């Protein structure tokens, strides 16, 4: 039921008049944009719709409403080849445009592949075949998706002109990082900011 409500809300928020209003309103309160590694291009523009955190302490001002709400304009795919997670649980609503997201394959997908293979094959072979398997999910205008802390993904393709999303995050859960050979690598080490 909860997912149905989110799907209906996503369709409403993606209506052109509503999406335009949200984007215009958010652009009055810029947040830190994410630049390319060389600092020449914007990878993602970010603006606040609602920031519950104190600017100085970064502590939530409202215990009863721990979510932050931003507008993101994703201009290009993730340049990193490895999947990454985020420091909080999040929900995204695609307001305008579309993208293709890469995520580790779900158990359902792996079971489907397994059922198509030779019966009685060595279980280690099945495990090897599906260990690093990924699936690609298309996210269109009006779609919504959840990404929990510790779930990995990457943006693989972005529509021309970029994709505009409403991005809702919960309380901080832990540092974010990249999934490298099945292990989480801290983002500072992965990006070379920390040796």
Predicted regions span which residues?
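A short hydrophobic beta-strand segment most commonly corresponding to one strand
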Residues: 144-146, 160-177
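A short glycine-rich, His/Asp/Glu-containing loop-to-beta-strand
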Residues: 40-78
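Conserved short histidine dyad/triad with adjacent acidic residue
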Residues: 70-85, 103, 149
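Short acidic-glycine-tyrosine-enriched beta hairpin
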Residues: 102-154
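Active-site or metal-binding loop neighborhoods of secreted/extracellular toxin and effector enzymes
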Residues: 175-195
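Short, conserved beta-strand element in jelly-roll/cupin
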Residues: 86-101
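Membrane-proximal basic amphipathic "stem/tether" segments
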Residues: 1-26
């Amino acid at each position: 039921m909860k997912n149905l409500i989110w799907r209906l809300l996503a369709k409403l928020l993606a209506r052109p008049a509503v999406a335009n209003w949200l984007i215009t309103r958010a652009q009055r309160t810029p947040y830190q944009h994410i630049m390319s590694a060389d600092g020449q291009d914007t990878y993602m523009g970010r603006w606040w719709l609602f920031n519950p955190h104190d600017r100085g302490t970064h502590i939530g001002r409202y215990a009863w409403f721990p979510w932050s709400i931003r507008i993101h304009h994703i201009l290009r795919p993730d340049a990193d080849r490895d999947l990454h997670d985020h420091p909080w649980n999040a929900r995204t609503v695609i307001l305008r445009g579309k993208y293709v997201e890469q995520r580790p394959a779900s158990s359902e997908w792996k079971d489907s592949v397994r059922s198509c293979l030779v019966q009685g094959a060595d279980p280690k072979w099945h495990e090897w075949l599906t260990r690093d398997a990924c699936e690609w999910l298309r996210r269109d205008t009006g779609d919504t998706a959840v990404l929990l802390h510790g779930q990995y993904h990457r943006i693989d393709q972005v529509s021309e002109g970029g994709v505009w999303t409403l991005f809702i995050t919960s309380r901080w859960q832990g540092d974010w990082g990249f999934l490298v050979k099945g292990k989480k690598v801290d983002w500072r080490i992965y990006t070379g900011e920390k040796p």
